Amino acid sequence: MTTCLGLAANAGGGEIHFREVSSAWGLDFRHNAGISGRMYMVETMAGGVVLFDYDGDGDDDVLFIDGGVLPGYEGQPPRSRLFRNDAGGDTPRFVDVTDAAGLDFDGYGMGGAAGDVDGDGDLDLYVTAFGKNELLLNLGTGRFRAGGVEREVDDPRWSASAAFGDIDLDGDLDLYVVNYTDFSTTNHKFCGPAGSDGAKADTAGARGYCHPDMYNGVADRLYRNDGRGFFVDATVESGLGDAAEAGLGVVIGDLDGDAWPDLYVANDKDPNLLFRGVGDGRFEDESLLSGAAYDRSGIAEAGMGVELADLDGDGRQDLVVTNFALETNAFYASAGSGVFLDRRYPAGLAQPSLQHLAFGVNALDADLDGDLDLFVANGHIQPNAAHIGEVGTYEQPNQLFENLGNGRFRVRQDVGLDIVRTSRGSAVADLNLDGDLDMVVVNSNQPSEVYENRTVGQWLAVGLSLSGQSEVGARIELTAGDRVQARETRAGSSYLSQSTLTAFFGLGAGEFVDRLVVRPPGPGRPLLLRDLPASRRLLLRR
């Protein structure tokens, strides 16, 4: 069954233009890292944002994930906040419903992901933390209740990103949680320039936040859903092992084209991990063989965020990993069968990212021309970077890389992304229902940003409602003229964040879609639609 939810007035080609609208839309949020002056490592690594339709009314709502109270902090306690989207007219209105929704998570929040874990038709939340993680179960009444302890996913270690996916294709959502290091406020160390030590006065400006190699990495966790929304730790039995790396980003998707979900983890100063799904929830470690574990010189980089999308238009899913300053961001182009080629230099992504420390990353068709562009959120971890001998400034401009076709990019400096802060998590969704993707950026201990996409062009938006299974992991293929585009629905990506579950396609000036194929996760039959008008929002039910 196909439902047409509406259309917007966009037509013709598009020149990229964004406008910052956080106050105008009622999305004022300032991240609070709980800074005490003691330079606790966790202070500089948060926070994330989740864009998801928690109330099932057809538009995406916004969850900002805040920090928490650390020893020595004396301000107001930080608090994660949920904003309900009351879209309508040219200017949407967001309402803070944190209290009404029963979101009383009071841990030190890092990131999150949203998915229907118990199969009741609404989206639940998983929030990662420095401390116990929490699963917030959506009651379907506009309220949530805590279920992390009950469902056995309340990992007490320092977790970063998380992602939902049906890793065994049994119809329910499993959960992968990325853990970072064993840092705590009790094993806190003095870190500064080479040769400095704790005898140096902090007031001399010599102290910085510690890098991850000062601590031990912590093993990630894979939780298998039992079909009722309860979870079992399946990390070891699935073949993932118990290796302890300093992980930050994760995506779940089909990396080798065999229809089984695979896992990719961005690690900080450790080799990135690629686990190939071989069936029934089992994995094989293909990290080294894949070509996506190191840079082209065989060096492990400081991976932060990760995106998985078809960036060169060949139908295969490519990887982008954001890295530390002087490393450049990585573009691993899929060569098929789970093999990747490092094409960051020929793609034009390396040199412009050399001086930046990048975190969030999102693939979106910003100009609606039919190929995917890239947004990258930048910001250093050291407020005194120059003083302690590190490259770059603390506040850094974010970047939009326009896709010139076939996976080659150029930086656009004139698109309205003018605010310079210290960015971390980022996500995209059509928040005002006008057919293009808007952006939300969380800045460390600073106000967040919301950018309305003002680009004009034709488009198609596809939402899914699949009876008996989640839409997460579905593949949607669109043919318009001689161009074929592919999207996968994903619950968790970028850095500590999640973007919309609705698939968006830019059509340029095209007025019709010749063919749309939806391939649900697992063995279900594909859904085929033909001759669709452009600039429509479709909700496909089965």
Which residues does each predicted region cover?
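Gly/Ser/Thr/Pro-enriched helix-cap/hinge segments flanking short amphipathic alpha-helices
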Residues: A11-H17, W25, I35-S36, G348-Q351, ...
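Beta-propeller blade termini
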Residues: R38, A46-G56, R84, Y108-G119, ...
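Blade-edge beta-strand/turn elements of extracellular beta-propeller
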Residues: F18-V21, P92-G102, R143-E152, G229-G241, ...
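Hydrophobic beta-strand segments that make up the repeating blades of beta-propeller
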Residues: D60-D66, D120-A129, L175-N179, D258, ...
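Asp-box/WD-like beta-propeller blade repeats and closely related beta-sheet repeat scaffolds
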Residues: V97-A114, V127-I167, V177-D213, V218-A219, ...
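Repeat-based blade/solenoid architectures
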Residues: L27-G48, Q76, A101-A113, E150-A163, ...
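Short, conserved, GDST-rich strand-edge loop motifs in beta-rich repeat architectures
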Residues: I65-P78, T181-Y215, A377-Y394
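Beta-propeller blade signature
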Residues: S80-N85, A219-N225, R276, A333, ...
